[in-house]
């Protein structure tokens, strides 16, 4: 945790002066990346928010299947024979997903003079009017007949025209983006994808999500360019080919070589812009800083082998040899835990040093191109190979700065190493605390939620996983499962998991946060903020990372110097993570609420007892958010705090979430918002507000 240093309040205008005029903006629409802050306690003003969304990515050809959603029920989309042997779009197969609709749709007033509490830092979408009768998802609802799942027309969710939809991305931002716009596009695409997974869309999910976003103007960096792409950083990862297309990293939907068209070449000159490796073609080899890339083509329309020709992408790569221009390289790798899932790693700028021809295994001519990585770039593919060796060869104790093999001492299913690469001679371990893998139940019972104990437990599931709408636990989640393949589908005011009275098995899809770590996490020493937490594994947006475990406290019990305190009453920066109904031709009132309004303040201290969650530091631009989880055990109801990935997170990236601030005030002189926290923030984000807690 960040070191505690008393500080003075910092005006918000010092951080983002452009935001001050937007305080009264209607937050029911989607900001590009800015929206007001939330808190439990009303205040006289409404603060601004400065939180980036998340990144998301996917592929766009016949093999566009969603690893989260499973294969299309209609089978692959046929396309014409390609000259491109480097078509690296991937297949991903998994069962179709489910998703969530909120039970508690408590939403703040549009009155900008009031703040509202946002547990995970989520925006309100305005009040939702409902007719009289039992609220949707009511705990005492007893359906008289089995519910039938809604059947969707595959064409009813496909956008044909933009209409009056405002993507809030200007023409200039569409052509040339920035970090904020790229994050927004990736987040919004993935939210649509998750929604399509939830309803088991019968056609290709990724193609539908991509097409809708493109037609509705949710895209950026459409101008083709040589060199760096604004808003995209070396080391960024993408789970789907088409994500790279939406944010302008790789514009070719099918080919592994992206190059200027004939018309563009007349202006820019013929050259290659980006290549994506597949790691599966003859003669293609990959070193940490070099790449031998196979040319494209080599088959006719019937799939028969033939000589590759010096045209298209091959001609562009040849031109880049003499031109000496930068070429972006994206490495396609197999997911470490899902053999049918690919991940794409942006590895930075390369130069095409030479090319030659060989006779391939088919007996026909093939081209080879050698690309060399430019120096002084952050490591990307090299980090992937390092953690791959750690996972596969168990080299923990031989690592630089190794201190302890397992900080949990066997309490977790996966070991939690402790390393200090900042000072290898310092073998000090974190201060004394008892490691607990999950929340201590004592004091965590949610007496505030008065459940009918006779209705607890999904008795009608009969020892089968909860997969149908007649399950009482599914009904509490709005008739849809909250997770799919261990991925959170929507943020909600509260998520209900199966508990002790439920006869469903331990592998039930609604039992996630209770079942412990599923990622290879490690605790490491940071340069400025003490101990931190990171993962060996790539993390997809929505992935459960860990629980924040500790002891439930009252205000009176909290110690002044407790740096390991989780507090739901803080003011959190808001961001939008759930999908926009308009991007799927749904009514705006169907928006799933992200506003969290717990009936009482929740304080959890991990100072004396805790798990890896206690080592997750604060950031004003976090990559993790928190979500309240409720479950029942032996007739009592308990509240847990789950920490989930906000966006795709590359391996060995520090995991951070927003700790919140104590209050936000408006200065009397110039109406500038002031964020007041007790500790100086050292997160280093461009949107750092200067303080926290």
Curated annotation (Swiss-Prot):
Name this protein carries in UniProt: Histone-lysine N-methyltransferase, H3 lysine-9 specific SUVH7
Gene encoding the protein: SUVH7
Family note: Belongs to the class V-like SAM-binding methyltransferase superfamily. Histone-lysine methyltransferase family. Suvar3-9 subfamily.
Subcellular location per the Swiss-Prot or TrEMBL entry: Nucleus; Chromosome, Centromere
Superkingdom of origin organism: Eukaryota
Limits of the YDG domain: 227-373
Signal keyword on record: no
Region (Disordered): 64-99, 111-175
Catalysed reactions listed for this entry: N(6)-methyl-L-lysyl(9)-[histone H3] + S-adenosyl-L-methionine = N(6),N(6)-dimethyl-L-lysyl(9)-[histone H3] + S-adenosyl-L-homocysteine + H(+); L-lysyl(9)-[histone H3] + S-adenosyl-L-methionine = N(6)-methyl-L-lysyl(9)-[histone H3] + S-adenosyl-L-homocysteine + H(+)
UniProt: Zn(2+) 1 binding residues: 458, 461, 466, 471
Binding-site residues, Zn(2+) 3: 466, 498, 504, 508
Species of origin: Arabidopsis thaliana (Mouse-ear cress)
Ranges of residues in domain Post-SET: 677-693
